[in-house]
Amino acid sequence: MNNRVHQGHFARKRFGQNFLNDHFVIDSIVSAIHPQPGQAVVEIGPGLGALTAPIGERMDRFTVIELDRDLAARLEKHPTLKDKLTIIQQDAMTIDFAALAEQAGQPLRVFGNLPYNISTPLMFHLFTYTQSIRDMHFMLQKEVVNRLVAGPNSKTFGRLSVMAQYYCQIIPVLEVPPEAFKPAPKVDSAVVRLVPHAELPYPVSDIRMLSRITTEAFNQRRKTLRNSLGNLFTPETLTELGINITSRAENVTVEQYCRLANWLSEHPAKQE
């Protein structure tokens, strides 16, 4: 039997589809999410409903976002879910989550077993809506979770670490082996909880500056900051801002990156 076929559906590589089928893992994720009736719950990529069905047992209504038209059609006909679901057949990268929260009249609780080929850009998309989100629970490649929670002075600390920690508190929930899926991915997975900060610990006046600085620094992570950020800051400015010019991108804390971003916002002439 083709191991890409599960419950009569052929897993599509272009959508990065791996379907969760381990009941212990499913129960653990649902318990971690702990959805309550009346909350504005949104699932990204429900697939064959491994999480959708048990979440549906606890909810009167909730929303799912599914790009695959065949899977969306299955959910529309699901005997116990069809009357509970608002199905949005659309790419989650194009969704206005602030509009969904406004329609719901409350912040969203977002969860999903994210396709690994879009998980990082999708999280960056969601970070722009954190004021409209209460929390997020995602199944991700374990390596991505390691990057999310990484601290400075580690090889896994990167732009994703800085931007995620700027917006959210990040809590690993559980690790998931490949055999919990069909077809089994070639990597380990993990579930993570992201809770947007009620108040940003290190607010920046222009998030584009933080994005630009972290992109330039980590795209040249083996260079010293004197070189990787040389087109934005003089060595003297870096020193005045408390940055060691001989350090590298992974040696700088989230707070220090935010300090750099705010300085750059206040000195627009330096951005040329």
UniProtKB/Swiss-Prot annotation:
| Entry keyword annotation includes rRNA processing | yes
How would you classify this enzyme at the top EC level?
transferase
Annotated S-adenosyl-L-methionine binding sites: 18, 20, 45, 66, 91, 113
The reactions it catalyses are:
adenosine(1518)/adenosine(1519) in 16S rRNA + 4 S-adenosyl-L-methionine = N(6)-dimethyladenosine(1518)/N(6)-dimethyladenosine(1519) in 16S rRNA + 4 S-adenosyl-L-homocysteine + 4 H(+)
**Recorded GO MF terms:** 16S rRNA (adenine(1518)-N(6)/adenine(1519)-N(6))-dimethyltransferase activity; RNA binding
UniProt keyword RNA-binding, yes or no: yes
Location(s), subcellular: Cytoplasm
Gene3D superfamilies attached to this UniProt entry = Ribosomal RNA adenine dimethylase-like, domain 2, Vaccinia Virus protein VP39
The record ties this protein, via Pfam families, to: RrnaAD
According to its UniProt record, the EC number is 2.1.1.182
Q: What is its main location?
A: cytoplasm
A GO CC annotation given for this chain: cytosol
Extract the InterPro entries matched here: KsgA/Erm, rRNA_Ade_diMease-like_C, rRNA_Ade_Mease_Trfase_CS, rRNA_Ade_methylase_Trfase_N, rRNA_adenine_dimethylase, SAM-dependent_MTases_sf
Q: Keywords in UniProt for this one?
A: Cytoplasm, Methyltransferase, RNA-binding, rRNA processing, S-adenosyl-L-methionine, Transferase
Function noted in UniProt: Specifically dimethylates two adjacent adenosines (A1518 and A1519) in the loop of a conserved hairpin near the 3'-end of 16S rRNA in the 30S particle. May play a critical role in biogenesis of 30S subunits.
Query: Member of which family?
Result: Belongs to the class I-like SAM-binding methyltransferase superfamily. rRNA adenine N(6)-methyltransferase family. RsmA subfamily.
* PANTHER family referenced in this protein's UniProt entry, alphabetically: DIMETHYLADENOSINE TRANSFERASE, DIMETHYLADENOSINE TRANSFERASE-RELATED
Instruction: Indicate what this protein is called per its UniProt record.
Output: Ribosomal RNA small subunit methyltransferase A
The organism named in the record is Pectobacterium atrosepticum (strain SCRI 1043 / ATCC BAA-672)
Q: What is the lineage of its organism?
A: Bacteria, Pseudomonadati, Pseudomonadota, Gammaproteobacteria, Enterobacterales
